[in-house]
UniProtKB/Swiss-Prot annotation:
Protein name, entry field: Large ribosomal subunit protein bL20
One biological process term in Gene Ontology: ribosomal large subunit assembly
One GO CC term, this protein: ribosome
Role noted for this protein: Binds directly to 23S ribosomal RNA and is necessary for the in vitro assembly process of the 50S ribosomal subunit. It is not involved in the protein synthesizing functions of that subunit.
Length: 123
């Protein structure tokens, strides 16, 4: 069986890892094994971070909508329920954008939600 020295395969793989680790502190950017562990750990955090980002943005939207609803004399849950009863189908991202950039528009939505809740029969 012939001897395999791995020439460029090994060096290319190592260079790729060390390039990804550039900017890391001390040995994590210089030594292959430490760099490999640091890069793998970083990739794990990046993967989970992409999932957390979605949750955090949804939470931010809800906080913004809740604050704007409070200014209009409603709680977040009352506001969202009122919109649902009124048949207004806007997602939280859009509602948050309206709340931050168009206060008059949000107030109009809040009034519609209040009217829908007032007209709703008591269950």
């Amino acid at each position: 069986m012939p001897r395999v020295k791995r020439g460029t395969k090994r060096s290319d793989r190592r260079k790729k890892i060390l390039k990804r680790a550039s900017g890391y502190f001390l040995t994590k950017s210089k030594l292959y094994q430490a760099a490999q562990e640091a890069v793998e750990r970083g990739l794990k955090f990046a993967y989970s971070g992409r999932k957390q980002k979605k949750r955090q943005f949804r939470s931010l939207w809800i906080v913004r909508i809740g604050a704007a609803a409070k200014l209009n004399g409603m709680s977040y849950s009352q506001f969202v329920h009122g919109l649902k009863v009124a048949g207004i189908e806007l997602d939280r991202k859009v509602l948050s954008d309206i709340a931050t950039n168009d206060a008059a528009g949000f107030t109009a939505l809040a009034e519609q939600a209040k009217a829908a809740l007032a007209n709703q029969p008591a269950a």
